[in-house]
Amino acid sequence: MAVALDSQIDAPLEVEGCLIMKVEKDPEWASEPILEGSDSSETFRKCFRQFCYEDVTGPHEAFSKLWELCCRWLKPEMRSKEQILELLVIEQFLTILPEKIQAWAQKQCPQSGEEAVALVVHLEKETGRLRQQVSSPVHREKHSPLGAAWEVADFQPEQVETQPRAVSREEPGSLHSGHQEQLNRKRERRPLPKNARPSPWVPALADEWNTLDQEVTTTRLPAGSQEPVKDVHVARGFSYRKSVHQIPAQRDLYRDFRKENVGNVVSLGSAVSTSNKITRLEQRKEPWTLGLHSSNKRSILRSNYVKEKSVHAIQVPARSAGKTWREQQQWGLEDEKIAGVHWSYEETKTFLAILKESRFYETLQACPRNSQVYGAVAEWLRECGFLRTPEQCRTKFKSLQKSYRKVRNGHMLEPCAFFEDMDALLNPAARAPSTDKPKEMIPVPRLKRIAISAKEHISLVEEEEAAEDSDDDEIGIEFIRKSEIHGAPVLFQNLSGVHWGYEETKTFLDILRETRFYEALQACHRKSKLYGAVAEQLRECGFLRTPEQCRTKFKSLQKSYRKVKNGHVLESCAFYKEMDALINSRASAPSPSTPEEVPSPSRQERGGIEVEPQEPTGWEPEETSQEAVIEDSCSERMSEEEIVQEPEFQGPPGLLQSPNDFEIGSSIKEDPTQIVYKDMEQHRALIEKSKRVVSQSTDPSKYRKRECISGRQWENLQGIRQGKPMSQPRDLGKAVVHQRPFVGKRPYRLLKYGESFGRSTRLMCRMTHHKENPYKCGVCGKCFGRSRSLIRHQRIHTGEKPFKCLDCGKSFNDSSNFGAHQRIHTGEKPYRCGECGKCFSQSSSLIIHQRTHTGEKPYQCGECGKSFTNSSHFSAHRRVHTGENPYKCVDCEKSFNNCTRFREHRRIHTGEKPYGCAQCGKRFSKSSVLTKHREVHVREKPLPHPPSLYCPENPHKGKTDEFRKTF
């Protein structure tokens, strides 16, 4: 607040029977000098803070000047460390105060922290006394006795009228006896005359309610008279619009005061019509403002609301019918600044208390990602004084769940601050036991309408997959309801997220081994009702799964089983025996409940066989083992699961053509001109050369004798396995589809692009690549064909890296990069070359390596015609022609066009030598120098030397893998 100026009350003058009071400044108080020492110290402090670099000639002089000013301000030769620290804290304390209060407090020059706090406390007490005095009703006819005369202090930023000591005598137990006496010891005290009867002054009601320097009318009554006399105008400087937002208590004080007296105030002899302002006051709104939209004002209002609630026991306001959470989204950027990202302790406790209400978690049970639920939670938070968006509420709850799981599983050392609250929310056993009452009301701080039913046994558990391949498409909050089946609590120890536990997978396979399930899967592997029944069986056993999750899990088990059986992976499948018993025993078993197939008209009458695009069953894989390896080793192509999820193609009849006709009983001729994928021909040759496990025989007579052909262990061709001729059109269609890898036929042709495909699913995949990309990035405008690709791309703009390595702390924005990074720590190298047996941790590295055996160099320079096997080498070569040097050293400003040379150059400045000799221990900054150094040991002792290790001195500056070079 501003400096309080005393009101020196001169001797009263009798003019025509009226008592005239004159208010003027106290010259002694204004002209009294400040204590020595404090003035000089404050002067040096201001000089130190306001010092400019332009005032001196150079940096040395600037530093010396600052040192001198700081020493003169803090005086380290006289003060101790604690005193200097106290001065710095006092300065910061005065800085964080509101602007006007800060100016008033700085003029007092407090010498200690207690004195600075006492100044602010004194101001708050004065404001509280002002509230109590003004809140008393104003009577026109009936006036208080002379002994109860009082004067209202105006806490203006520039001037504050202080009560005379006569009022203090009326308050023997005043709380201002401490610091108030120290401030008023220099003031002249003059008691009011006994014949004076002052009436309370009120600010004039101007049209804008914020007029500066208002003329305030004070009514004085003559001695023994009851009629008001002509007023005497006393000029008071009052800037209400500025001070009302700086001191919330004074704002509320004057709001209540004006509401009571707005009809009785007379300013300058004219009444003011204030019906609209009274209406706004009744609605708890300020009559002088239309809305508070600035961040500073909102934060002050919020703190004032919390303060009033704690001091005056104001109840939580009823739910307003005004702005809802949807309208919050239309607020400006300033509201987003208030919302922020950080959640305080009190805000989080309130948030968890709201979520404990039964209607919220019951609604989330039905729909985990219900935006309306989080919108209602955000509205409740807003009523409690916290502004949050629905998306922020959802993200916060997700983060709390993640921290709770880490602490519970022992993955995080530091404790979760809200572990007990989350445990009570997510664990039914942690809740209080139910009493005789059906619903027990548990009191929640700051919320009186939230009732928690202790009888509700619902656990909200969310498990995220570390790889997050689906990009939260199937990840959400899953609710587990306890089953009455014996042993269900043990099963509930497994988290019900995307991850499947061992016991849950065993139960899932046991359910699939039932006759009704595998026979239905035999007919159609994508039947949603079938997986829905499996999900129901899992739910009865205590595991909550969706039909889509069951289908995806079964597909994943099929893929793992196929890889292990064909020797494509080194590690064994945990459920290999169960899958082998499920597939092999059921494949040859008869199907008594299978409906008889209706024989269709012979296709010989039409002169040929027209192979229709039919969807493969669950017992017949969509891709061969060779194609599966291609998709595993090349991350740019669509995965097998993505192909399965493509809808069945339904296009015009003329879109698919079969150029070759096959007759039953006729021999199938081999076509030497095979139509292959133009963009995958070389990669297919590489993979087939390294992963081929069957012979490429084209003799149709040997086809029926082979039980495992091209790795297709999922085929359900009873006629082929038993050596019987296939008479049914369905079996014949499968035989034709199977013979295509041997005859090279690709009957499906896309007319628009002229490319042929061997399977209808491949055609649909190709059409997917050529269609319009519906998912567009709002930042850069890039389009994508799948939503998960857009989500993964948006992390580039937001900088989000949700995948964090627990070993080194490095974060990634993509699950594939995170998985490749984890192989560095585990040493896993699942990709093996079929020629030399060398293993790699990434599929892209295997593809690049295989080009050394085939001699393929797909990247050719258009300028000089030079070819490269690696895209990075090709990009570095192009910079030779363009002259681009993107890698610039910050120390010497030297530029490089190659990142490898740039890293070698950086080691000159850092002194890093990551390459060390295993024999003599010498270290080098370049691998080429280490190679030359090895020749010295070879000449001395011509024996095979041990490989030297790449051990960087600073693991954050160099590579982390081993460096080995052989001769």
UniProtKB/Swiss-Prot annotation:
Pfam families recorded: KRAB, Myb_DNA-bind_4, SCAN, zf-C2H2
Compartments where located: Nucleus
Ranges of residues in domain KRAB: 229-300
GO MF, one annotated term: DNA-binding transcription factor activity, RNA polymerase II-specific
Phosphoserine found at: 591, 600
Glycyl lysine isopeptide (Lys-Gly) (interchain with G-Cter in SUMO2) cross-link, renumbered residues: 22, 242, 259, 277, 337, 482, 529, 734, 745, 752
Zinc finger (C2H2-type): 775-797, 803-825, 831-853, 859-881, 887-909, 915-937
UniProt cross-references to PROSITE patterns, sorted A to Z: KRAB, SCAN_BOX, ZINC_FINGER_C2H2_1, ZINC_FINGER_C2H2_2
UniProt similarity note: Belongs to the krueppel C2H2-type zinc-finger protein family.
Protein known as: Zinc finger protein with KRAB and SCAN domains 2
Native source species: Homo sapiens
Gene encoding the protein: ZKSCAN2
